[in-house]
Amino acid sequence: MKKYKSEISGHLDIIVTENEDNFEGEKETWKEIQIHGDPEGLKSFARLLIKLADLRQDDLDELPVGAREHIHLKPKYDLSVSSEEVIVGRLDAKGTGAFYGKYISKEFK
């Protein structure tokens, strides 16, 4: 059996926090994704993002048309034990460039 080799080196912690605030009697709730790491962990995460961004999906025979390349980052193996599992991937689909249906673009002003 081949030993798992993480693309993340150093220390990287990715957590979700739930926040709540009351303003003028109105309760507001929101979530935040927090990404923290030591220099080595942050740099290896950056390299992973650049690798995904530069990847030519159309050249991947094993990736079906319409699919999106992605990588799973798992607590204990890639991330700290306190982290949530994270999937980092391309928004654009192979062959079509289409974004998935749930995507809502940010507003440009």
Task: Go through each PLM region and give its residues.
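Positively charged, low-complexity terminal tracts
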Residues: 1-109
